[in-house]
Amino acid sequence: MPKAVRITHGNLWANIESMCAAADLRAGRDVMVSWLPLFHDMGMVGFLTLPMCRGIESVCVTPADFLSRPLLWLELVSRYGGTCTAAPNFAYALAARVLARADGLDLSSLRFALNGAEPIDVSAVQGFLAAGERFGLPPTAVVCAYGMAEATLGVSFHPWGTPLQVDVLDAVALETDRRARPADPGAPAGSVRTFPVLGPPLAGIEVQVRDPQGAALAEGGVGVLHLRGDSVTELYLSVDGPRPTRDADGWLDTGDLGYLSGGRVVVCGRVKDVIIMGGRNIHPTDIERVALQVEGVRAGNAVAVRYVPAGRRESFAVGVESREAGDPAAVRRIEDGVRSAVTAEMGVRPALVAVLPVGTLPKTPSGKLQRSAAAALLDRLTAPN
């Protein structure tokens, strides 16, 4: 059932103040560039309300403008001397590809390019930074972040002006023991999982990690992230009336999995998306990363979801888009390639691999994958007539 998040003036102002402090945003110096939709919290709060409240210059176009010509985003940064921007992870992967064919840009002014609103792929960040290097893009420009509407917007930002920090974890410890244990040096790719390390919680926000029984975990324990603070909402508004969001001690259950590392937040995924097989808690983003490496799979267009075939135990399905979806031989090759690659690297075999035409996977107006809708789509494709 749809529900709205009630954000008070106090919530809003507390979050704007803490984000401006973390990003060191200043009127008269900074120029914010955005194509984000204004009906989404990142665009509405971060790139409309915040610059209006703080008197910061803002340059905005629509998501349709960006999706029809992605290079426009970076052309605006170059033209107006943009210092701050933000986008979901897929946009940075897309930008890396268009930058490879671009000329005449100056990205040296961009000091704060926030990556958030969906799972962050470290390789996408690194690819964007590498592609932008010849245009003067600072190597510390990308700021990996975590936020949610229930916290108004921002929860944790990687400290700007510092290099990307990545945790390389032992997959067995993560998926079986729910521990963030560093992988052994030289461990094969299939036995490790990588996550960007964010920053400490923004000022005025506390983060606690809890196990399935609700007990607080020490650093390195992987569990559900809980939030408390001035920018965290107290109520959902639904057709049945207001619903409290916090427990008796003021903590909000985010539904996100993660851990703390040196007081810094690391996000692993969503509880509802985790695929449980053989006692392992497998994050779909790890499966998607492998599937995207298969020849013929369209960049940024793969999804892994829970899947329970009739009469069988829980497994998972993988859907990928391909420009070759109309060629039966190519479809078989891609299906076999995805199945083999995922099995080899992840140690689990998908029950279903579906090769779909371009534009099939459901996405938001800003281009983010809608995982639950994709799961329903794959169910429909395999349902008996």
Where are these regions (language model features)?
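Conserved AMP-binding A3 loop
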Residues: M1-A14
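Alpha-helical scaffold elements adjacent to nucleotide-binding pockets in ATP/GTP-utilizing enzyme cores
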Residues: N11, N15, F47, L72-L76, ...
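Conserved AMP-binding/adenylation subdomain of ANL enzymes
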Residues: W13-V31, D41-T83, V98-A102
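Phosphate-coordination loops involved in phosphoryl transfer and adenosine-cofactor binding
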Residues: G28-R29, L110, V222
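AMP-binding/adenylate-forming catalytic core of the ANL superfamily
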Residues: S78, T85, G229, E234-L235, ...
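Gly/Ser/Thr-rich phosphate-binding loop
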Residues: G82-A86, V98-S191, E206, Q213-A215
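Conserved ATP-binding/catalytic segment of the ANL
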Residues: F195-Q208, P212-G220, V224-P284
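Conserved C-terminal "lid"/linker of ANL adenylate-forming enzymes
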Residues: I275, N301, V305-R306, A317-V318, ...
